[in-house]
Amino acid sequence: MPIMPSTTYHKYDVTDYEAIDPAYGTMDDFTTLVDECHKRGINVIIDFVMNHTSSQHEWFQTAYQYLQGLPKGAEPDALECPYVDYYNFSKEKLGGYYPVEGTDWYYEGQFWSEMPDLNWDNEMLKTEFEQIVQFWLDFGVDGFRLDAVKEFYSGADDKNIAVLTWFNDMVKSKKEDAYLVGEAWNDYSVYAKYYQSGMDSFFDFTFADKDGIIADTVKGINGASAYGKSLVNTQELYGSYSDTYIDAPFYTNHDMARSAGYYSGDYSEAQTKLGNAMNLLMSGSAFLYYGEELGMKGSGKDENKRAPMYWSTDAED
């Protein structure tokens, strides 16, 4: 999850892209973390939210207040307020749009009213993010995990791929060996085409979650041969879009129930271990959600799925 300042516990509503949320420490702490990781041969990637900001971000607040100050019927002028073009404002109340109080304007916020969507048609916004990327690379970051890449333009894969192509090329021009992984939550037949962007990896959602291919195989719903065929089919499809792709298999994440709760009965612990082993043995760069190695449980509300790491045997107390 993101480490930047935010109004929420999950930090996906960023208020400042060039700082650390005080709950996690300081920039000095982060520098120490990166340095110590690098000494041990560990690379550091950070969660990067490009689909939306917080409604409390300076960009949005400036644009929102500018629209509130416009005379009725007047059109916004980006020369007067560049930030008004950083977001998607409309006089039509479309799906996922919310009112700008005191005006006849609406803004897009597909995930939540407090997370307004960014407008990736805007070149100045791209310049802003190029500077933000450089900021984190200067601190030694080795790559980025891009959140919700399928929603930059909801339902328009080609436009999403174009943004990712720009981002990949921009980052690699600054750090050739940077690692980029994207979250495009869908079936593999959809996110496979996103490899056209040149991005290194995309999370392999087809194998994840309580009803994914791994869990269904462990439960005996699918046989071993079907599991093997799924591996071959996905790898062949990804390879048809990119000859440099690195699969990003995972078993569960912060939006899913934890895997220790997928199974019941006398063999549940063994099944949990088997599922995680299958994930780690897939080709590519496997991701392990913190706490999975301990058998942490959590389901239902998002807060339960994102409980703090158990650092000691009495953590539950």
Where in the sequence are the language-model features?
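Active-site and adjacent substrate-binding regions of carbohydrate-active enzymes
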Residues: M1-D317
